[in-house]
Amino acid sequence: SDMTKEQKDGLLLEVEKLHKRHVLAENVGLDYYEPGMMEYLAQSDGSFNEATGELVMYFESKGTRYEGRTEQIEKVKCGDEVCVIRDEKNPFNRNNFLLLTRKGRDIGCMPAELCNALAPLYDEGNLIVETASVSFVEPISKRSRYAKQAVLFVELRATIRA
């Protein structure tokens, strides 16, 4: 079945939120954020071409300090392939997607709001993941000693069947 208007609106909202973060990063002064926050803001982005169905999202991996992920992220480099795996048995969110390395190492989860927008489309066969890769990574070893977790962003390219 086709994507519903509600599903499409939900998707467009999430794409717009990611893109707004990127635009904000370009337009606000450096003193607007705590040091270090600006570059992360700029790492988010999103676009959806309704004519072609091409979806591109740059989003932050969540939960990087749990499940031994901090250690796995030390081994990850920009451009590394990411496997986006549907995780419907997740006790916290049945819409979850896990982010794994090519070797199957767990490097986090897609943000919940994105999962909630994408999972119904994915489950109905209306979203096909084309490629996913690490677009930005800062392992905890490279961050300030006050940092509690690694930072990792993923570039996801997908096709939406209208």
Listing of model-derived features with the role each one plays in the protein:
Residues 1-162:
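Conserved active-site motif detector
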